[in-house]
């Protein structure tokens, strides 16, 4: 599951936070691909739901950070917090063509302002 661009309305710096599952033991390349899926999904969602904040993030250099959680349960706990805060986010599930089973939730993404 990937967690992407989220926004706190009081902060000044925008950044995208990608929350990646560490328990899946994905290769570095797989992690990079899942993070890219998360970033793209979140940016497209922000374009529709919060274009002004997306423009701000783009203008500030598109800062991104990747953090980890140790289970799918923890990932969905983070998603619940993002939803409660009104942050744009998306869940990324894998197609299962390479390293992990189809439908495995790998990360979440959100757009945030910190």
Kindly label every feature range from the protein language model.
Residues 1-2:
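Terminal signal-anchor or tail-anchor transmembrane helices
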Residues 6-49:
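Glycine- and Gly-Pro-enriched alpha-helical subdomains that act as flexible
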Residues 8-12, 57-59, 98-102:
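Solvent-exposed alpha-helices and their adjacent loops that cap or buttress functional pockets
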Residues 15, 62-64, 105-107:
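Short, solvent-exposed beta-strand edge segments and adjacent coil->beta transition regions
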Residues 19, 66-70, 109:
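Short hydrophobic/aromatic beta-strand micro-patches
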Residues 36, 41-64, 68-73, 84:
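Compact, glycine-rich, soluble single-domain proteins
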Residues 61-101:
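Mid-chain, well-packed structural core segment of small domains
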Residues 111-114:
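Conserved small/polar residues in nucleotide/adenosyl-binding loops
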């Amino acid at each position: 599951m990937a967690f992407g661009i989220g926004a706190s309305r009081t902060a000044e710096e925008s950044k995208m936070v990608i929350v990646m599952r560490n328990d899946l033991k994905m290769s570095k390349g797989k992690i990079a691909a899942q993070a890219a899926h998360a970033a793209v999904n979140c940016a497209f969602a922000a374009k529709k739901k919060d274009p002004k904040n997306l423009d701000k993030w783009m203008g500030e250099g598109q800062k991104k950070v990747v953090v980890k959680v140790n289970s799918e349960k923890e990932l969905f706990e983070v998603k619940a917090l993002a939803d409660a805060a009104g942050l744009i986010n998306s869940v990324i599930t894998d197609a299962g063509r390479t390293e992990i089973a189809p439908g495995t939730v790998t990360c979440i993404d959100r757009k945030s302002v910190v």
